[in-house]
Amino acid sequence: MTFIPLKNTSEESGRILKHAGTISLFTLLSRILGAARDLVIAHVFGAGWITDAFVQAFTIPNVLRRLTAEGSMTLAFLPLYIEIREKNDPHAAKKFAAKTLGVVLGVTTILTGIGMIFSPELVFLFAAGFASSPEKFELTVLLTRIMFPYLIFVSFVAWSMGILNAEGRFAAPAAAPIFLNVGIIGSAFVISPMVKDPIIGIGIGVLLGGIIQILIQLPSLIKVGQSIKPRNFFNDHNIQRLLRLLGPSLVGMAVYQINIIVLRNLASFMPSGQVTH
């Protein structure tokens, strides 16, 4: 019979509790700041057609985010990263991660370019009801184009969060969502008063929040020895495995996102302010 030393068990339990406490604290702060963000936007802009335009515009890159960032990182990348690290060596896992980053940045950059070009068509897909109000429709298109690059930033963040969680670094990933809210809240008071259409300042704040999220991940990535320079991923066996794993999971997640598109579209036909609520 093998006995587990109580000291080691106690130390492991202590680490788990510490990590759980850190994650819980940052999650709570993120929720509080999220509520504060909504209050600030409501206070500055009210609950009308302008905030409806912002909400609909932000929904579009967020729907893609759930496919390219959260879904792919959680369902495909992270299990493969851990498997490669355990079967081969940490260096091989880091190389795989850098190649995955190349895929992520390549795909999201292409999607962002396409999304910015075809923003009017996407806005009509998500909010056909806005077409009856040219001013609202055009503002939504403009905000969509401004915020679309957030898809690139948040996908990088999801990639780094997956690596850091696998390496037992939980503080920076847990804290990252806080800074999106910080960027939006700060922009409402600093940038919005400086631009012709104040709501555009909130769109810029989304981008700033995404950049800050990346910056706070970098020190932890350096500590675990992860390069942020994308590597050539063509003809890589593990990247091919990653793409095969992604296929079925993306189809399943896309079904749920279609539901969001339908609901947003229906809401766009309702009176101003209903989308925001």
Predicted regions and their residues:
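Membrane-embedded alpha-helical bundles of multi-pass transporters/translocases
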Residues: 1-277
